[in-house]
């Protein structure tokens, strides 16, 4: 049974730890991200036999409160022979699905796999700080239809990937502020070539309009 469209399988092949999976509504980001999780845990996505992982790590899915409450993710799990209910799962791993509002509950989790859905890691608030801490001790990916409008939107993900130590380093290397502004206001970015290369390294585009 074919579980993925060709464009989804291509995206899985391009994905890596710390990437942003980009796709619009209906592209199947949830299913594709779970396929990547299975692949990272030893599953053969090309086999004609049922998907089977080898001692999969615990899975945490951080999503919107609406998606958590409507059980949208729960509907995707059985396709990969998984369940958040241990009695219904063929694996011994733990699956947790929760909202961004509760992300601080998982700040001390280690050696697990995180899927951050409808990513909210922009700015420097509590969600971002917790996300960066989680990223240091776990494997993770982000799902987003709109990954970033400006270069500063990418700062948390760049830090989580180890490209920069902190926001200050990013600003020192890439941001020029307006000189006579009453408050910090960005005038322009410098060394943009490096930013473009880093963004290309983490973005995985899945344009379902191109599927064949």
Regions found by a protein language model. Name each.
Residues 78-109:
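Inter-Walker segment of RecA-like/P-loop motor cores
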Residues 21, 61, 98, 114-115, ...:
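Hydrophobic positions in the central parallel beta-sheet of the AAA+
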Residues 56-58, 113, 130-210:
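Conserved P-loop NTPase motor "coupling/switch" region that bridges the ATPase
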Residues 30-37, 45-79, 148-153:
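Conserved Walker A/P-loop ATP-binding site and its immediately adjacent core
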Residues 117-119:
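Walker B catalytic acidic pair
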Residues 1-22:
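Conserved pre-motif I regulatory segment
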Residues 15, 36-40, 157:
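Hydrophobic residues on the short alpha-helix immediately C-terminal to a glycine-rich phosphate/catalytic loop
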Residues 17-36, 144:
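Walker A/P-loop
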């Amino acid at each position: 049974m074919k579980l993925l469209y060709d464009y989804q399988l291509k995206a899985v092949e391009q994905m890596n730890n710390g990437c942003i999976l980009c796709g619009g509504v209906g592209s199947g980001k949830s299913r594709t991200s779970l396929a990547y999780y299975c692949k990272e845990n030893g599953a053969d996505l090309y086999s004609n036999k049922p998907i089977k992982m080898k001692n999969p790590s615990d899975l945490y899915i951080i999503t919107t409160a609406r998606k958590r409450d409507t059980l949208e993710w729960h509907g995707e799990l059985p396709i990969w022979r998984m369940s958040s209910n241990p009695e219904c799962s063929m694996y011994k791993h733990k699956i947790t699905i929760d909202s961004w509002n509760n992300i601080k509950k998982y700040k001390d989790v280690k050696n697990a796999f995180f899927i951050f859905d409808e990513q909210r890691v922009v700015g420097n608030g509590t969600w971002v700080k917790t996300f960066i801490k989680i990223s240091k001790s776990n494997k993770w990916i982000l799902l987003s239809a709109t990954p970033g409008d400006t270069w500063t939107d990418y700062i948390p993900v760049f830090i989580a990937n180890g490209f920069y130590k902190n926001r200050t380093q990013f600003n020192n290397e890439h941001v020029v502020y307006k000189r006579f502004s009453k408050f910090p206001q960005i005038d322009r970015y410098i060394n943009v070539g490096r930013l473009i290369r880093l963004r290309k390294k983490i973005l995985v585009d899945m344009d379902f309009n191109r599927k064949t």
